[in-house]
Amino acid sequence: MAKVSSAYLKFALVMILLLSVISAVMSAGCIKNGGRCNASAGPPYCCSSYCFQIAGQSYGVCKNR
């Protein structure tokens, strides 16, 4: 088995922690089902990843598909 430098291991650990924090922040900022959303706008997004919006309306509703 090849030796891995401690600097590489530290870097990998920091990257994993950073990605975990980013993922937690992004999921915490989502809109729950029943909340208002805009399918064509940016964050926050629906937790279900689906915004039901009828054409011509300014907002939609987060729901499961």
Swiss-Prot record:
Function comment: Possesses antifungal activity.
Signal peptide as annotated in the record: 1-27
InterPro entries the record matches: Antimicrobial_C6_CS, Gurmarin/antifun_pep, Gurmarin/antimicrobial_peptd
Protein name: Antimicrobial peptide 1
Keyword vocabulary terms for this entry: Antimicrobial, Disulfide bond, Fungicide, Knottin, Plant defense, Secreted, Signal
UniProt GO BP: defense response to fungus; killing of cells of another organism
UniProt subcellular location: Secreted
Positions of disulphide bridges: C30-C47, C37-C51, C46-C62
Native species: Phytolacca americana (American pokeweed)
Lineage, top ranks: Eukaryota, Viridiplantae, Streptophyta, Embryophyta, Tracheophyta
Family note: Belongs to the AMP family.
One Gene Ontology cellular component annotation held by this UniProt entry: extracellular region
Main subcellular localisation: secreted
Coiled-coil annotated residue ranges, if any: none
UniProt-listed SUPFAM superfamilies: Gurmarin-like
Recorded domain comment: The presence of a 'disulfide through disulfide knot' structurally defines this protein as a knottin.
